[in-house]
Every structure is written in structure tokens, then in C-alpha cells.
């Protein structure tokens, strides 16, 4: 349905069906590229609740730029992991590999129970005052 619009509308990145949070939708392909390409280093921040305690050594491991996910031929770009509680963390990425947050946390023994993307670049979900499923137009200068 979205692709049949003129101009076509696409999302800036994706969220899997088990993930909630901020999703941008636009008809500007250059904007999508600017926001999603690892070359532009646009931060995407996620909050995760895990089924097991998150090991402290994961902070340094994720930041190292040497962390490899199964099935990948390149290591993950350095990521910032903040452990908020033993089973709750905030993870900042500048790339978007398939199910990356879930795979990274599972690889260190802390499978994700719930996941929410809380920001993309300078746009923060909590500042938008939106309920789940609500949407609003955003001016390009807000990003």
C-alpha cells in the first residue's frame, strides 16, 4: 500500500514485530540514506530488558569494534552499552545489522525480553509525547 503512493513512502530503518519505539516514515530517499547509512554515523538508541543479567564486560566488548556476530563477515561497529540495571540497558548503534541488538545481547548471555528504539539522531521518543501507535508529522529541521 505504501509503495503504490506517488511518491512512494518508506521507513527509515525497520523494527521487527517484537520491537516497539520510534519509526520514521518519509518519501525522501536521500533522507533515508543519510539516516541509515553507517557512513553518516547517525545514532540509534535502544532500551532493552533482558532475561538474564547483562555481564559488565559487554560494555568494553561492544565498544571495541571487534565484536563479531554469528553469520557476519565483519565485526560490529563500536557501540555504547549503558547498563541501567542488571537486566536493563541502553545500547547506542550507528549501524543496523539484522536483529543486531537482540543478537548482540544474546551472544553475551542476556537474551532480550523487550526492546524499544528510543531515539534516532537528535529525535527522542520521550520528547514527542506519543502513545504507542500514534504518529505525527515532523519538520525536517527537527532532525
Task: Spell out what each predicted region is.
Residues 1-143:
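Basic, flexible Lys/Arg- and Gly-enriched helix-loop patches that mediate nucleic-acid binding at interfaces
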Amino acid at each position: 500500500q505504501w509503495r503504490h503512493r506517488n511518491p512512494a513512502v518508506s521507513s527509515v530503518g525497520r523494527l521487527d514485530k517484537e520491537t516497539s519505539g520510534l519509526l520514521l516514515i518519509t518519501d525522501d530517499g536521500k533522507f533515508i540514506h543519510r539516516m541509515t547509512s553507517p557512513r553518516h554515523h547517525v545514532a540509534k538508541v535502544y532500551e532493552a530488558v533482558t532475561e538474564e543479567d547483562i555481564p559488565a564486560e559487554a560494555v568494553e566488548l561492544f565498544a571495541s569494534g571487534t565484536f563479531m556476530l554469528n553469520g557476519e563477515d565483519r565485526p560490529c561497529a563500536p557501540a555504547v552499552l549503558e547498563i541501567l540495571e542488571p537486566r536493563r540497558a541502553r545500547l547506542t548503534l550507528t549501524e543496523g545489522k539484522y536483529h543486531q541488538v537482540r543478537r548482540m545481547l544474546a551472544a553475551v548471555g542476556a537474551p532480550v525480553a523487550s526492546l524499544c528504539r528510543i531515539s534516532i539522531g537528535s529525535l527522542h521518543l520521550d520528547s514527542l509525547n506519543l502513545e504507542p501507535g500514534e504518529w505525527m508529522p515532523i519538520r525536517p529541521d527537527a532532525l
